Amino acid sequence: MYRILLTGFLPFGGESVNPSLEAVRSIQVEFPNVELIRLEVPTIFGEAERMVIEQVSFCRPHAVLCTGLASGRTDVSIERVAINVDDARIPDTAGQQPLDVPIQPHGPAAYFSTLPIKSIAQAILS
């Protein structure tokens, strides 16, 4: 069984809906031997990371796809690089607003996706 972990954030910043979570909820898998595991994560620094790590340890997925909302964007964006810094434009739902704080102090400055992001974006937008 091929397991895919999909994450989406709960609403924050005064919004009643988070499109990332709605997208995760709406995806239907129709492939044999594919198990889709959905995880709703809070918009709380540290807590979201803890929950994803815990779920990865528990279900041992073959792939992890984390979705999120980038306010102001009108199209789907696939990110190639995850920067190892928490830097919040607005406070999270617990009132935390870290600025230039390393997520993993001893980790690399950034993490690069190994997914074919251009073909994924093209498939989503077509």
Indicate residue ranges for each PLM-predicted region:
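N-terminal catalytic or cofactor-binding beta/alpha core of small enzyme domains
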Residues: M1-S126
